[in-house]
Amino acid sequence: MEMTVFRTKVQRAVSEALGEEYSVELREVQKNNGVILQGLMIRRAQENMMPTIYLNSFLKAYEEGATFADIIRKIVTVYREDAVGKQIDISFFTDFEKVKDRICFRLINRDKNRSFLEKVPYIPVLDLAACFYYAYDGNGVQNGMIPIYNNHMSAWNVTDRELFACAVKNTPRLFPCDIMPMESALEELLEELQADVRQHLAREIPMLILTNAGKTYGACCILYPKVLEQLAKRVDGDYYCLLYTSPSPRD
């Protein structure tokens, strides 16, 4: 089934399952590197929280044999477990003084995110872009992210450089870097191997992973003060840094 047909059927079925008290909308969501995901946004009357549930994995499950009724039940269950009854007061977001201490940055590819970068403030970093978000954590929402758009910057009457100055201070504080050997990151995959095999892999592939404590947007750690210097000391020489970013849809 084509996604355009599938998402329309899902929207109609979820709307019928929840009733007239709920608003169910379709939305295309642009992720990193030009990836477009199909989202279903659900909001109950009198609530201001409207989570997005991505449909791409549900279409795949349907094509692999899941019934359409099962798909709808799963979507409704995900919504009820995660969103019902939650209210977020976002009035604070109009006041720069109230948000400046949680403004952070992430790094994305400039060429692959041109259309997105037209809408947001950012600082060029080589072929990358440091763009900004508010790290929201409260009211039952953990590791939430509110992207900062050009209209926010205008309303706050600040510049992209001022946002960057805040983000450079906040991001390492809220999301400290974590440097680990590759084998530590792959420990679960390697634990079934014999000890001598693991040791051999560690010797033959002496790679390190640089990320942050939240394991999200870890590429930004290359801009943390003295982090690259720490890496040079740890490897005791020159090194190459391979950046990896990927969308993190709610599957």
Predicted regions and their residues:
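Conserved small/polar residues in nucleotide/adenosyl-binding loops
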Residues: 244-249
